[in-house]
Amino acid sequence: MNPNKIDAIVVHCSATPAGKDVRAADIDRMHRAKGWKMIGYNYVIDLDGTIEIGRPLTMDGAHCNTAGVSGVAYNKHSIGICYVGGIEGTTNAKGQIVPKLDARGRQIPKDTRTDAQKTAMHKLILDLFHQYPIVEVIGHRDASPDKDGNGVINRYEWIKDCPCFDVKSEFPIAICRASKT
């Protein structure tokens, strides 16, 4: 990816249970197991708020291949930020943190960000606004297709729940731009 073309941020979750300590190296292994060259995200925010570097910004991302407002796949012009979590967790009989399942046996999406993760995410996004001409901050789910053509990505249109919170309302462009002054 050409860093001069970066104009968007896409926020993700790792889709791992709340409280389970997962690091960028773990996500890298998961992504390589899928046949990818390396971790798809540029940044990973750990449970304690540590921001880890993932895929270099000089490489195309591997986090959101949907085309954005520019008509170009986000992987070509966006920064991918992933927070660890996003699935409701529970502790099993062995004391391991595992996904909590609903009545149909599906994982339960949930905003599991710790206070430290929220603080780190806000700082990182505002820092990126100072470094790049960002015009869009979205959650991965916001890149789902607008099936009914009403200009809004409604919940029933989401391909996935990731990142399990409303990124657009938490990071409105006007507020982020105002932070530059």
Locate predicted features.
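Basic/polar, cationic surfaces and motifs that engage anionic cell-wall
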Residues: 1-10, 14, 18, 48-51, ...
